[in-house]
Amino acid sequence: MNVEVAINDKKTMEIIAYEMKYVNNRVEKSDIVCIPFEVEFFQGYMRIYNECFYEMRKALDIQPYNFLNEYNQIVEKVKDIYLLLNQGEITGSVACYGNEIDDLIVNKKFQHKGYGKQLLLWGMQHIRAKSNEPITLHVAEWNNDAFMLYKKVGFEIANVEKIR
């Protein structure tokens, strides 16, 4: 539950995030194939990334609301970012940093069609191919749809973190 607290006459929403872990060795098979990130897709990726996180960042007053605006913000991370394409258009993306899944996004026009789950499973398989360590991810309490997906797939809360 989010709680509003008055700080210096400004209302600030408390931000709670869950660290979640998947400890099973077996991962359900994904029906998709992702490709490594390529710079030619940056503009589309940036648009989708910002669209996906805008509502949450605004609701939680995390500024800037449109965080991603330059390639150099992700240049060190692109080797771990994977894209799902549909006829050359980005359907979604998932980042796999070691044993952590991050920045799982689905193009708004493809949402609610199962791509989020498929990207999650693909990322989990990608990690499992290299390691049997627990797979981790973080999700804001605000993002209940993502939280419920992660629980349904088998992730469990390992830690509750108060961000602000």
Regions found by a protein language model. Name each.
Residues 57-90:
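Active-site rim helix/loop that mediates acceptor-substrate recognition in acyltransferases
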Residues 1-31, 164:
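Acyl-donor-binding surface of acyltransferase catalytic domains
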Residues 83, 88-105:
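Conserved beta-strand in the GNAT
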Residues 104-112, 140:
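A short, internal acetyl-CoA/4′-phosphopantetheine-binding micro-motif in the GNAT/acyltransferase core
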Residues 1-3, 137-147, 163-164:
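Conserved beta-strand-loop-alpha-helix junction that forms the acyl-donor binding cleft
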Residues 33-47:
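A short beta-loop-alpha structural element at the N-terminal edge
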Residues 110, 114-123:
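Conserved acetyl-CoA pyrophosphate-binding loop and the N-cap/start of the following alpha-helix
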Residues 47-60:
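Helix-loop element at the rim of GNAT/NAT acetyltransferase active sites that forms part
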